[in-house]
Amino acid sequence: MKLYTKTGDKGQTGLVGGRTDKDSLRVESYGTIDELNSFIGLALAELSGQPGFEDLTAELLTIQHELFDCGGDLAIVTERKDYKLTEESVSFLETRIDAYTAEAPELKKFILPGGSKCASLLHIARTITRRAERRVVALMKSEEIHETVLRYLNRLSDYFFAAARVVNARSGIGDVEYERSAIVFRDRNSSES
Protein backbone atom coordinates (compact mmCIF):
# COMPACT_ATOMS: atom_id res chain seq x y z
CA MET A 1 0.00 0.00 0.00
CA LYS A 2 1.28 3.46 -0.88
CA LEU A 3 1.15 6.22 1.72
CA TYR A 4 0.07 8.76 -0.84
CA THR A 5 -3.15 8.63 -2.85
CA LYS A 6 -3.01 11.92 -4.80
CA THR A 7 -6.74 12.38 -4.05
CA GLY A 8 -5.97 15.40 -1.85
CA ASP A 9 -3.83 17.25 -4.35
CA LYS A 10 -6.58 19.77 -5.08
CA GLY A 11 -7.13 20.79 -1.44
CA GLN A 12 -9.77 18.31 -0.35
CA THR A 13 -9.63 15.28 1.92
CA GLY A 14 -11.80 12.26 2.50
CA LEU A 15 -14.06 11.84 5.52
CA VAL A 16 -16.30 8.98 6.59
CA GLY A 17 -19.20 9.72 4.25
CA GLY A 18 -17.83 12.47 2.04
CA ARG A 19 -15.09 14.93 1.20
CA THR A 20 -14.30 18.39 2.50
CA ASP A 21 -11.77 21.17 2.08
CA LYS A 22 -8.54 20.64 3.97
CA ASP A 23 -8.94 24.00 5.71
CA SER A 24 -12.44 23.24 7.01
CA LEU A 25 -13.17 23.48 10.73
CA ARG A 26 -13.73 19.73 10.83
CA VAL A 27 -10.26 19.01 9.43
CA GLU A 28 -8.75 21.73 11.63
CA SER A 29 -10.39 20.10 14.66
CA TYR A 30 -9.17 16.58 14.12
CA GLY A 31 -5.84 17.87 12.81
CA THR A 32 -5.25 19.69 16.09
CA ILE A 33 -6.15 16.50 17.95
CA ASP A 34 -3.58 14.67 15.81
CA GLU A 35 -0.99 17.32 16.71
CA LEU A 36 -1.82 16.81 20.39
CA ASN A 37 -1.49 13.05 20.04
CA SER A 38 1.95 13.47 18.47
CA PHE A 39 3.00 15.76 21.28
CA ILE A 40 1.89 13.21 23.87
CA GLY A 41 4.23 10.79 22.09
CA LEU A 42 7.07 13.20 22.86
CA ALA A 43 6.05 13.36 26.53
CA LEU A 44 5.94 9.56 26.62
CA ALA A 45 9.43 9.38 25.16
CA GLU A 46 10.62 11.69 27.96
CA LEU A 47 8.91 9.55 30.63
CA SER A 48 9.99 6.21 29.17
CA GLY A 49 11.84 4.09 31.69
CA GLN A 50 11.67 6.63 34.51
CA PRO A 51 10.68 4.90 37.75
CA GLY A 52 7.65 6.25 39.58
CA PHE A 53 5.72 7.20 36.46
CA GLU A 54 4.37 3.83 35.31
CA ASP A 55 0.77 4.90 36.02
CA LEU A 56 1.13 8.11 34.04
CA THR A 57 2.88 6.33 31.17
CA ALA A 58 0.03 3.81 30.88
CA GLU A 59 -2.57 6.59 31.08
CA LEU A 60 -0.91 8.65 28.37
CA LEU A 61 -0.88 5.65 26.06
CA THR A 62 -4.58 5.10 26.72
CA ILE A 63 -5.21 8.80 26.04
CA GLN A 64 -3.40 8.49 22.71
CA HIS A 65 -5.81 5.74 21.69
CA GLU A 66 -8.79 7.79 22.88
CA LEU A 67 -7.58 10.83 20.94
CA PHE A 68 -7.37 8.65 17.85
CA ASP A 69 -11.02 7.79 18.53
CA CYS A 70 -11.82 11.52 18.91
CA GLY A 71 -10.27 12.25 15.53
CA GLY A 72 -12.15 9.37 13.95
CA ASP A 73 -15.42 10.49 15.51
CA LEU A 74 -14.91 14.00 14.15
CA ALA A 75 -14.29 12.60 10.66
CA ILE A 76 -17.77 11.02 10.53
CA VAL A 77 -20.25 13.01 8.43
CA THR A 78 -22.74 10.23 7.61
CA GLU A 79 -26.20 9.71 9.10
CA ARG A 80 -24.94 6.54 10.79
CA LYS A 81 -22.87 7.62 13.77
CA ASP A 82 -20.59 4.76 14.80
CA TYR A 83 -18.78 6.75 17.47
CA LYS A 84 -15.99 5.16 19.49
CA LEU A 85 -15.29 7.62 22.31
CA THR A 86 -17.43 6.90 25.38
CA GLU A 87 -18.52 8.72 28.53
CA GLU A 88 -16.45 6.18 30.48
CA SER A 89 -13.36 7.87 29.04
CA VAL A 90 -14.53 11.20 30.46
CA SER A 91 -15.23 9.60 33.85
CA PHE A 92 -11.78 8.01 33.90
CA LEU A 93 -10.15 11.41 33.37
CA GLU A 94 -12.20 12.87 36.22
CA THR A 95 -11.04 10.07 38.53
CA ARG A 96 -7.40 10.65 37.63
CA ILE A 97 -7.71 14.45 37.96
CA ASP A 98 -9.09 14.00 41.48
CA ALA A 99 -6.32 11.55 42.40
CA TYR A 100 -3.54 13.76 41.05
CA THR A 101 -5.01 16.86 42.68
CA ALA A 102 -4.99 15.05 46.03
CA GLU A 103 -1.40 13.85 45.49
CA ALA A 104 0.11 17.18 44.45
CA PRO A 105 0.93 19.93 46.95
CA GLU A 106 -1.94 22.24 47.73
CA LEU A 107 -2.40 24.91 45.08
CA LYS A 108 -2.79 28.42 46.48
CA LYS A 109 -1.56 30.68 43.69
CA PHE A 110 -1.58 30.68 39.92
CA ILE A 111 1.37 28.76 38.52
CA LEU A 112 3.41 29.13 35.37
CA PRO A 113 4.08 26.23 33.02
CA GLY A 114 7.42 24.76 33.99
CA GLY A 115 9.34 22.79 36.55
CA SER A 116 10.64 19.55 35.10
CA LYS A 117 10.99 18.96 31.37
CA CYS A 118 8.19 16.39 31.38
CA ALA A 119 5.85 18.68 33.35
CA SER A 120 6.58 21.42 30.82
CA LEU A 121 5.69 19.04 27.98
CA LEU A 122 2.40 18.20 29.71
CA HIS A 123 1.64 21.91 30.06
CA ILE A 124 2.18 22.30 26.31
CA ALA A 125 -0.14 19.33 25.76
CA ARG A 126 -2.69 21.17 27.93
CA THR A 127 -2.52 24.26 25.73
CA ILE A 128 -2.81 22.22 22.53
CA THR A 129 -5.85 20.52 24.07
CA ARG A 130 -7.42 23.92 24.73
CA ARG A 131 -6.82 24.91 21.11
CA ALA A 132 -8.41 21.66 19.93
CA GLU A 133 -11.35 22.37 22.21
CA ARG A 134 -11.78 25.85 20.71
CA ARG A 135 -11.72 24.38 17.19
CA VAL A 136 -14.35 21.78 18.14
CA VAL A 137 -16.57 24.48 19.69
CA ALA A 138 -16.34 26.49 16.47
CA LEU A 139 -17.16 23.37 14.44
CA MET A 140 -20.21 22.46 16.50
CA LYS A 141 -21.72 25.89 15.82
CA SER A 142 -22.23 24.90 12.20
CA GLU A 143 -22.06 21.10 12.06
CA GLU A 144 -23.14 18.12 14.09
CA ILE A 145 -20.41 16.44 16.12
CA HIS A 146 -20.11 13.71 18.73
CA GLU A 147 -20.56 15.87 21.85
CA THR A 148 -18.57 13.49 24.05
CA VAL A 149 -15.48 14.69 22.16
CA LEU A 150 -15.96 18.20 23.56
CA ARG A 151 -16.49 16.95 27.12
CA TYR A 152 -13.43 14.72 26.80
CA LEU A 153 -11.21 17.57 25.59
CA ASN A 154 -12.45 19.83 28.37
CA ARG A 155 -11.49 17.24 31.01
CA LEU A 156 -8.26 16.37 29.22
CA SER A 157 -6.81 19.85 29.59
CA ASP A 158 -7.52 19.66 33.34
CA TYR A 159 -5.93 16.20 33.39
CA PHE A 160 -2.72 17.56 31.84
CA PHE A 161 -2.62 20.38 34.39
CA ALA A 162 -3.01 17.93 37.29
CA ALA A 163 -0.56 15.45 35.75
CA ALA A 164 2.09 18.14 35.21
CA ARG A 165 1.85 19.11 38.88
CA VAL A 166 2.21 15.48 39.96
CA VAL A 167 5.23 14.99 37.71
CA ASN A 168 6.89 17.96 39.39
CA ALA A 169 5.94 16.69 42.86
CA ARG A 170 7.22 13.17 42.21
CA SER A 171 10.42 14.65 40.77
CA GLY A 172 10.94 16.77 43.87
CA ILE A 173 10.51 19.98 41.87
CA GLY A 174 8.12 22.69 42.99
CA ASP A 175 5.57 24.39 40.79
CA VAL A 176 6.63 27.77 39.42
CA GLU A 177 4.30 30.26 41.08
CA TYR A 178 3.24 33.38 39.22
CA GLU A 179 5.09 36.01 41.25
CA ARG A 180 2.30 38.61 41.19
CA SER A 181 -0.43 36.16 42.12
CA ALA A 182 -2.37 36.70 45.29
CA ILE A 183 -3.75 33.69 47.14
CA VAL A 184 -6.55 32.64 44.80
CA PHE A 185 -7.26 29.07 45.87
CA ARG A 186 -8.74 28.21 49.24
CA ASP A 187 -7.43 25.53 51.59
CA ARG A 188 -8.65 22.04 50.59
CA ASN A 189 -9.92 21.51 54.13
CA SER A 190 -11.62 24.88 54.38
CA SER A 191 -15.36 24.81 54.98
CA GLU A 192 -15.80 28.04 53.03
CA SER A 193 -17.16 27.73 49.51
Swiss-Prot record:
Keyword Cytoplasm: yes
Pathway(s) it belongs to: Cofactor biosynthesis; adenosylcobalamin biosynthesis; adenosylcobalamin from cob(II)yrinate a,c-diamide: step 2/7
Reactions accelerated catalytically: 2 cob(II)yrinate a,c diamide + reduced [electron-transfer flavoprotein] + 2 ATP = 2 adenosylcob(III)yrinate a,c-diamide + 2 triphosphate + oxidized [electron-transfer flavoprotein] + 3 H(+); 2 cob(II)alamin + reduced [electron-transfer flavoprotein] + 2 ATP = 2 adenosylcob(III)alamin + 2 triphosphate + oxidized [electron-transfer flavoprotein] + 3 H(+)
EC number: 2.5.1.17
Binding-site list for ATP: 5-13, 22, 130-135, 154
Membrane-spanning ranges: none
Keywords for the protein's UniProt record, in alphabetical order: ATP-binding, Cobalamin biosynthesis, Cytoplasm, Nucleotide-binding, Porphyrin biosynthesis, Transferase
Localization: Cytoplasm
Gene Ontology biological process: cobalamin biosynthetic process; porphyrin-containing compound biosynthetic process
One Gene Ontology MF term: ATP binding
Family membership noted in the UniProt record: Belongs to the Cob(I)alamin adenosyltransferase family.
Complexes and interactors: Homotrimer.
Protein name, per record: Corrinoid adenosyltransferase
Taxonomic source organism: Bacillus subtilis (strain 168)
